[in-house]
């Protein structure tokens, strides 16, 4: 069992190893941070080995997607807000995303994590605030 766990950790670390940045990101992160809304999806051009495989397989520059959930005060439901606090120990004013990462599961991360990455906003057309909160609730329930 320990050998299998060791091998699994090694493979995960190998696949998730990120290459250094080779160029300046193509987006204005400050503008994106201002314009993004809860339930927007951010497409990310990843730099890991698994990202390279995904980009090759899908014939797309995007290898990762994250769900923007806003700041803690943007979450209407107090139970969901508490669950996010259980998974994220940073500042309550931080802009947050939910993402799934190989070897980590579904986690809460600061939007600022992607400041130097090539990212784009993907926004559902005409989504209501209630629908956006439902999408966020669905993602929050899957943390862990």
Tell what function each PLM region has.
Residues 1-144:
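Cysteine-nucleophile amide-bond enzymes
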